[in-house]
Amino acid sequence: MPKYIFLILCLVLAFAAHAQTYTLSGHVLTDTDDGVGNVLLEVVDATETVVATFTTDCSGDFSIADLAGGTNYTLRATKEGSPFNGNSTFDLVVTSRHLLGIQELPSPYTLAAADVDESGSISVMDMLLMRALILAINDAYPGSNWLFFRPGDPFASVEFDFVLNADMTNFDLITIKKGDVNGSANSCE
């Protein structure tokens, strides 16, 4: 009889631990630490089911509660808005100075902003795409207008995998606007 009680107790504790819920929270910021609003965050489970959504306000803060512990999740980040936001001829000048070797772009994030065709390098093609957007010849860049990064990771993504075994705070994302090399985009648009 004590063996059965012990077995039942172990099963109850295992189910109780699995039923534990946690919170994922953090900030969506520019590379200059300004909050970014209107970012849609979706938490997706392994079956591609959206289990939670959150849209940031202008502070960029987010908190997503009641996520089951021990589950593999993916956080998807998207931001809509005008492709023209933050794109100007000054961005073309700064990018051309970089290409000519006159003045290097100051960070991996500005390098990513200048790589509007997402080829992995900055070229004249990026400048042509910037020019076409500024002159309204094109109405968007290839892919998404906003790129997302985890701090310290220079590779952009829109999906970030995680497993919750406790509340996860400071799950921060850095975002930049494509083509906005000088950081002038309205991050709350």
Where are these regions (language model features)?
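Bacterial Sec-dependent N-terminal signal peptides
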Residues: 1-23
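Cellulosome-associated attachment modules in secreted, modular CAZymes
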Residues: 20-189
